[in-house]
Amino acid sequence: MKAAYDCRATKRACSDRKVLILGTNWANPQSGTMEKITISIVNDKATGNKRNIEEEADESPPPKKLRSAVFLCSTPSSAPHCSRDVDVFDEFDDTILERSEDESDSPLHMTLVQIEELLEGDSDYAAEPPGWEEESDTVLQELAVPNADGSQRNIVEFRNLNSPLVEEQSDSSHTLTEETVCSQDTSNYAAMAPSPCWSSISTAEQNGEAGDNVLSVCPITSPVLHKNEVNRGSVQDCSEVCNDSDICSTLSSSHLPGDLKVVDEISEDSDIPFDGDIDELLTLSPGDTTSEDEDNKITSESTPASSELESVPLVHSHTEAIYKTPSSLQCPVTFTASTDPSNLSQLSVSSVTAINGQNNSNKVPLPPSDTAPGPQLPADPCSQSSKVLKVEPKENKVIKETGFEQGEKSCAAPLDHTVKENLGQTSKEQVVVSIGCKKKVKPSQLQQKKLGTLPTKPQAACRPQISNAELEKNRNIYRDRVMMHLEVHNIPGEPNYELATLLNETSRENPTWQHPSDYTRRNYYVRKQPVPCSLNDWVMRNGGPAIERFHGLPCTFQRSPMPGVLPTGPS
């Protein structure tokens, strides 16, 4: 490439320059090979002033805008969660774009109109799935419940629809028909009721043995879908289907394990179409029939049915739990074990008989028991306690054991004991049975820890005491042996012998002279320390100033300016 600069001689020197781009062949540039482009370069630093730049308008059309594909979900309710740029999706305008033959609006090769039609079809499919009538016919079951007069009446199980429809149906009707469901706005998918789930199922066998006119269906917290009644044209009122006295016994019997199995079978056999959304699947909870708040509310209500069940003598509560058959009445009654020692009292035979006489009027049958009522231990305590230990709480063992020992002395108890006192009586017997099974095994003597004796403390070594007579005797023996040794080796010409003889004689004759052997470490403390003296005193003792011993040393020390040169002496 070759660039030619055309500089203008103006006040702004070298401020405006034009660049001409030519072809690759510098010698013979061919016209038409490249488009002539004029570039204006402005250098404002020459003058420091701003100037307007005339820019050429871009005549070429703008490039095609890239459209980011936004995929909407199959249901309108989950669209805000799946598409983040819904507003941007509506702002795109492709009217100025020219569509080619091989070009489409989306990677799915579908136009915008087709996508909208597909979404509308999905919402209709989700709102009204096919097979709604068939599914409701197969899932809803009719239960035969005996009436007071012995006739049978068909009652349709209800569905628990956890939706805003519950608040709308809280009036006197408490029923929900198929027409009201179809009349709702099907376009608003979020406002629709979730998938139905069974809330309670009862069997006619349990109600038959109970002997009470209790209906298996009682729509309290959720509306009831009476489809068969709508077809017949006679919708029964909720007050006729069930009354307030049958609420607790009916719903409490729906918490049984047998009912849960029926719920699982119905939920597995149901043919509910899947519309591609998991919001409906998350609401399916057949196992959780009722919430904990409903259970607490039901047990707290004082109804005739629950009061009759609580008045059952609790002496047979243990045997009833063991010999209970599937055909017997299964109604969970919650009791609270009393941990107060004062409430742990025995029941006599007369009191138990009186309580049984009062309960004979109840319609709840008691299972047969071979043993007489009262605080009697079973024949096989170990086998009986294996079942008791699973139910008995651990915190009442110590208190109940002491209460049983005190209860053996008492032979009568008042008849106005509460239910909690009777429960304490029964649980106390169970604990005693479990205690009787345990055999106390004494630890063997081999396992007992033997106390060992501590080792004797070593006594401090004392210095041996030698008498003076014995010491003198040993000294003489040692000296005689040394002298004998010297006499044997007595040679006059030996220099060591002569030196030793001289030192011995000198030390004996001159007491001021000390033997060299006394200067050893053994006799060092015997020497007299010399008296310290000053330097002048030491000079006077050693000859005085007449001795020219320190002649030449200066009175004051002067450092030599050069090393190796001694300072000059005094003149």
From Swiss-Prot:
Residues 365-378 have a biased composition (Pro residues). It is found in: Nucleus. Residues 270-280 have a biased composition (Acidic residues). Keywords: Nucleus. Residues 270-312, 356-385 are annotated as: Disordered. The keyword Ubl conjugation does not apply. Residues 299-309 have a biased composition (Polar residues). GO terms for cellular component: nucleus. GO terms for molecular function: calcium-dependent protein binding. Pfam families: S100PBPR. InterPro entries: S100PBP. This is S100P-binding protein.
